[in-house]
């Protein structure tokens, strides 16, 4: 609410590290680890407030996660172009990341290089997705850094939340580099079969 996101609902979601913002439904889903705090929306009958009073005992990491997801909601409200691109390519990525490696392996095992190349192209969609995700995730963390203090986190805890947000952004950089290296590995395997 403090960020002007009155149209965003908050819902608990089972599991751990399952926190995410759904731009299609304008829903901020908070994992059961974090949602166990009744102050995170369940006490609000409209499920529209995200207020984290200092008395909640909310961990620094949980506050950072919430702030990051609110950052995504802010990106959605501002119609961030990278977020729109990411949403548009999700279907291709789901298919490509699921079948791409299998097509590559099958193509190599059965010496069907055309199939392996198709698999590499399909897997390439997942690699592109990781790089499109970078500005989205880094942007959400940047927005979260700007208002993490408004969540009732001050002093050393605020510094800790900032460190968590920066570390989270770096995990996406690592994921993108890992995807690129995996793509290059598959490329070398396929190209090496031509000899």
Language-model segment annotations:
Residues 1-97, 128-195:
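Polar-ligand-bearing catalytic/cofactor-coordination segments
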Residues 74-82, 103-114:
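Membrane-helix exit/interface motif
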Residues 112-122:
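Hydrophobic alpha-helical transmembrane segments
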């Amino acid at each position: 609410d403090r960020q002007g996101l009155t149209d965003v609902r908050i819902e608990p979601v089972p599991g751990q590290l399952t926190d995410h913002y759904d731009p299609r439904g304008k829903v901020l889903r908070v994992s059961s680890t974090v949602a166990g705090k009744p102050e995170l929306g369940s006490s609000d009958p409209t499920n529209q407030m995200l207020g984290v009073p200092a008395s909640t005992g909310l961990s620094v990491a949980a506050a950072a996660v919430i702030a990051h997801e609110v950052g995504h909601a802010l990106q959605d409200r501002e119609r961030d172009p990278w977020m729109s691109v990411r949403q548009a390519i999700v279907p291709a990525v789901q298919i490509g990341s699921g079948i791409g490696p299998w097509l590559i392996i099958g193509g190599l095992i059965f010496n069907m290089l055309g199939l392996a190349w198709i698999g590499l192209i399909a897997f390439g969609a997942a690699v592109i997705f990781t790089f499109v995700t970078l500005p989205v995730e880094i942007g959400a963390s940047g927005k979260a850094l700007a208002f993490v203090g408004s969540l009732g986190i001050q002093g050393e805890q605020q510094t800790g939340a900032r460190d968590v947000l920066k570390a989270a952004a770096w995990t996406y950089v690592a994921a993108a580099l890992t995807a690129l290296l995996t793509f290059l590995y598959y490329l070398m395997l396929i190209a090496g079969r031509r000899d």
